From Swiss-Prot:
This is Trem-like transcript 1 protein. The chain crosses the membrane at residues 163-183. The keyword Protease does not apply. It comes from Homo sapiens (Human). Its main location: membrane. Detected in platelets, monocytic leukemia and in T-cell leukemia. Phosphorylated on tyrosine residues. It is found in: Cell membrane; Cytoplasm. Keywords: Cell membrane, Cytoplasm, Disulfide bond, Immunoglobulin domain, Lipoprotein, Membrane, Palmitate, Phosphoprotein, Receptor, Signal, Transmembrane, Transmembrane helix.
Amino acid sequence: MGLTLLLLLLLGLEGQGIVGSLPEVLQAPVGSSILVQCHYRLQDVKAQKVWCRFLPEGCQPLVSSAVDRRAPAGRRTFLTDLGGGLLQVEMVTLQEEDAGEYGCMVDGARGPQILHRVSLNILPPEEEEETHKIGSLAENAFSDPAGSANPLEPSQDEKSIPLIWGAVLLVGLLVAAVVLFAVMAKRKQGNRLGVCGRFLSSRVSGMNPSSVVHHVSDSGPAAELPLDVPHIRLDSPPSFDNTTYTSLPLDSPSGKPSLPAPSSLPPLPPKVLVCSKPVTYATVIFPGGNKGGGTSCGPAQNPPNNQTPSS
């Protein structure tokens, strides 16, 4: 009864409160939903709120705050009074027949008033059909056993060409790096040998010619060295097997026990002395030695107190 009276009042006051106001235009595709909020005065908190659809014969109520706000079966419009002067209306699963003009109304102390008007336009599902067609074409392309290629996507051969070129470029860079490293290592080794040869040449030229003996023979360590590398070999001292040493009296003048004969000792290996000082060679004649005047030549150090050995 109350709703009937409200509709009658709306028929009489159709233009009151909405003169000069235009409805809000909303557009939504088929199957979507809209959410509309309406503001009312705080004095109308306990008043009845209605969401209705404007028709030529009047405003048809769709949902009201006075009834159960739970969603019944088949209902696609919901009204919620949030309090504080805010009313919220939601329409879900829109269809083409839902297009039209809607409004929020409140039955307050001043009578029925329209709070907000909405003009809803439902878009046809053309875009959705095109999207569905594109999706079905993609599914058919993937499900085709013949492997029909999509013209929008490049083939597998076209995709593999950049990968092949990238691999070739990477291999070329690696080969160039290895060759450059080998050339630098060889050049560095050649420079090192040249510096060593110049150092040895300068050292040989600075030494006393009388103290240096160059041996170039077919045997010994000098034969194993290359001809382009300068080398030095000093004469080794005479062996203890010489008859000059074996004929010397080895009795100690102080009565100490004499040392064993040198011939009983193992021969010492030749010593190679590299020294920058000149070496003095002298002939020493031991008294009481070999009557035949046998002498032995060998390297001798400088005598102490600057005394020159007799010859």
